[in-house]
């Protein structure tokens, strides 16, 4: 859907008037100088000779010019005298004797009268300066308001973009995949906009507002555009941050202007992206004082959304946020945002549908199995998958291929997950050997401990900012629940790299820093969040945060606990991590020969994957006394 063009007739009329006035002024100023004839210019010496020769009749002496008229000459004595003499001009010089010469010859002379300004020039002298001042003032006003019409009050106008139906870029529900539940909820809104009588006949009321919540990149904005495209109604889109302005009251004025425009074009949809920019709870301390600009904007939004219609037509408000926990409760009450629709990351089937949509836009090789790509991308949102397809196409173009292959997709996945290959980062032979054993340690422990997923690739090619190598584990299915045993398996797999360094080199390096951090965090969550402690029992010591789609940041705050309880938590976390470490050591000691063989092979090839890797890892044996 394209942006609806703004009417331009006012600007065109102003341009015509401006150019017409400019041309008129230029003609009046330049025409006299261009078309008025000037007397011939002569040297001052010739002028003196003519005065001495008694040929001059009269002289007008000016500051910058002397004009004089010659005496008429008689052709013959029986004929009339010729017409008046010729008028000439010359440039004066400092000559104090000139008046005496003129008087001695009896020549009439006088000072030239001062030039008189015309009525037009007088008018310009009064009009032009104020016009210049007004023009400069208008220029800076328009510059501060990005050229928007409305002059000094333009900042009170809504900055919403209006999308209308009718072009090839129209978005429908067919362009959205992986969020079937959200599509179903919005389909009801679309159906009401198309056939309102079906609902009003039963006394039903459509929700006045629908709030789309979910992680970034899951398609909330795309869903709102698709809803407007399916309904075939005008679609107003604006970001929450565009309401807030430096001027006090501008945000509230823009809210009023937005809803006034929406009422005029009803039925329509108003979409407010990033609602948390103006909808934060007033009780959270986010506002500094009762007259804060954001609070005024929120109050105006609450007022406008409290049930409004335009001549029986409907205006529906859609909004999107990834921080619903920060929104004001008054904004979420029934009658304003009646529904909250979760737009979550897609599952395997959803990822496959999204890949099929974006794969239509590129030249795909016939051998590509999109289901394999969907399986290798757990946790990817719609925007991540779109970027993945584009990265694969760019890689194919870089390699001058005719189509995009599955190898391009695998490389694109690794670029997104682990970062770019750093082939220019040269490691010493010793460091390269340490990295090789470290990554093989992860792989061998992961092959015995299935809780972390299937090992798909081992690489010692540096990637990203810090990774000197990596072991890629891919889940075989979408998982939503993990048991205690699987979490312990993940901890043991994370510590497999450090365990391999201890066994082979009898020392440890800084390469396991991230592994230790992740293992400790996971063990702490087992104790404080999931209640997986035999000593502390089924208690949660973390204050959970619901609907936190942006990640945990600094982590959930811990409840107030006694010193003894805090000590028990630390001991339990330490015991879980140490147990995982011992499991990793036992597995690698039991498979020491295989560890050496795979490490030598990866030092030669740098990358092992596919059937070769599966064959090697299939030889791993679990020790008989493995502690679980």
Curated annotation (Swiss-Prot):
InterPro entries: AAA+_ATPase, AAA_lid_3, ATPase_AAA_core, ATPase_AAA_CS, FtsH, P-loop_NTPase, Pept_M41_FtsH_extracell, Peptidase_M41. Disulfide bonds: none annotated. The active site is at 439. Induction: Slight induction by UV-B light. One of its GO terms (biological process) is protein catabolic process. Keywords: ATP-binding, Hydrolase, Membrane, Metal-binding, Metalloprotease, Nucleotide-binding, Protease, Thylakoid, Transmembrane, Transmembrane helix, Zinc. Residues 36-119 are lumenal. Disruption phenotype: No visible phenotype. PROSITE patterns: AAA. The keyword Membrane applies. CDD domains: RecA-like_FtsH. Residues 1-14, 141-628 are cytoplasmic. Its EC number is 3.4.24.-. It is found in: Cellular thylakoid membrane. It is a multi-pass membrane protein. GO terms for cellular component: plasma membrane-derived thylakoid membrane. Pfam families: AAA (PF00004), AAA_lid_3 (PF17862), FtsH_ext (PF06480), Peptidase_M41 (PF01434). ATP binds at residues 214-221. Acts as a processive, ATP-dependent zinc metallopeptidase for both cytoplasmic and membrane proteins. Plays a role in the quality control of integral membrane proteins. Homohexamer. This is ATP-dependent zinc metalloprotease FtsH 4. It comes from Synechocystis sp. (strain ATCC 27184 / PCC 6803 / Kazusa). The gene is ftsH4.
């Amino acid at each position: 859907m394209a942006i609806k063009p703004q009417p331009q007739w006012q600007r065109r009329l102003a341009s015509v008037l401006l150019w017409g006035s400019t041309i008129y002024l230029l003609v009046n100023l330049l025409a006299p100088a261009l078309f008025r004839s000037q007397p011939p210019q002569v040297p001052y010496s010739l002028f003196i000779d003519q005065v001495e020769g008694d040929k001059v009749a009269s002289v007008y002496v000016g500051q910058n010019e002397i004009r004089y008229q010659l005496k008429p000459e008689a052709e013959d004595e029986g004929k009339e005298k010729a017409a008046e003499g010729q008028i000439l001009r010359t440039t004066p010089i400092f000559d104090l004797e000139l008046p005496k010469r003129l008087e001695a010859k009896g020549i009439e002379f006088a000072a030239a009268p001062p030039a008189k300004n015309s009525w037009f020039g007088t008018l310009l002298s009064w009009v032009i300066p104020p016009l210049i001042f007004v023009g400069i003032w208008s220029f800076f006003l328009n510059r501060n308001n990005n050229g928007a019409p409305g002059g000094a009050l333009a900042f009170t106008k809504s900055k919403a973009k209006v999308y209308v139906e009718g072009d090839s870029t129209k978005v429908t529900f067919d362009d959205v995949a992986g969020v079937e539940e959200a599509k179903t909820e919005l389909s009801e809104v679309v159906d009401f906009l198309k056939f309102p009588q079906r609902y009003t006949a039963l006394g039903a009321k459509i929700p006045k507002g629908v709030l789309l919540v979910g992680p970034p990149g899951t398609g909330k904005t795309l869903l709102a555009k698709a809803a407007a495209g399916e309904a075939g109604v005008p679609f107003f889109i604006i970001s929450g941050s565009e309401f807030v302005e430096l001027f006090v009251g501008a945000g509230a004025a823009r809210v009023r202007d937005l809803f006034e425009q929406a009422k005029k074009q009803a039925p329509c949809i108003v979409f407010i992206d990033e609602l948390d920019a103006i909808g934060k709870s007033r009780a959270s301390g986010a506002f500094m004082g009762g007259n804060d600009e954001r609070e005024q904007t929120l109050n105006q939004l609450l007022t406008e959304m409290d049930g409004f219609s335009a001549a029986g037509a409907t205006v529906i408000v859609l909004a999107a946020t990834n921080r619903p926990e920060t929104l004001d409760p008054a904004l979420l009450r029934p009658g304003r945002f009646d529904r909250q629709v979760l737009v979550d990351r897609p599952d395997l089937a959803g990822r496959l549908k999204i890949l099929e949509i974006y794969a239509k836009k590129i030249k795909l090789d016939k051998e590509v199995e999109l289901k394999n790509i969907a399986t290798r991308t757990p946790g990817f949102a719609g925007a991540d998958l779109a970027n993945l397809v584009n990265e694969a196409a760019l890689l194919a173009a870089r390699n001058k291929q005719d189509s995009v292959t599955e190898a391009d997709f695998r490389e694109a996945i690794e670029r997104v997950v682990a970062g770019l290959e750093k082939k220019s980062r040269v490691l010493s032979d010793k460091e390269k050997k340490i990295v090789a054993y470290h990554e093989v340690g992860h792989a061998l422990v992961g092959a015995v401990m299935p809780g972390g997923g299937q090992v798909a690739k081992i690489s010692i090619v540096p990637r990203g900012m810090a990774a000197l190598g990596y072991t890629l584990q891919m889940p075989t299915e979408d998982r939503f629940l993990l048991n205690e045993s699987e979490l312990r398996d993940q901890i043991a797999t994370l510590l497999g790299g450090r365990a391999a360094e201890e066994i082979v080199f009898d020392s440890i390096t800084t390469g396991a820093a991230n592994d230790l951090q992740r293992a400790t965090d996971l063990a702490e969550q087992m104790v404080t969040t999931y209640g997986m402690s035999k000593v502390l029992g089924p208690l949660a010591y973390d204050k959970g945060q619901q609907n936190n789609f942006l990640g945990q940041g600094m982590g959930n705050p811990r409840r107030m606990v006694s010193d003894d309880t805090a000590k028990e938590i630390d001991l339990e976390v330490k015991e879980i991590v140490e147990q995982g470490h011992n499991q990793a050591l036992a597995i690698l000691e039991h498979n020491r020969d295989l560890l050496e063989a795979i490490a030598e092979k990866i030092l030669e090839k740098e990358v092992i994957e596919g059937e070769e890797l599966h064959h090697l890892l299939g030889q791993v044996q679990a020790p008989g006394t493995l502690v679980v």
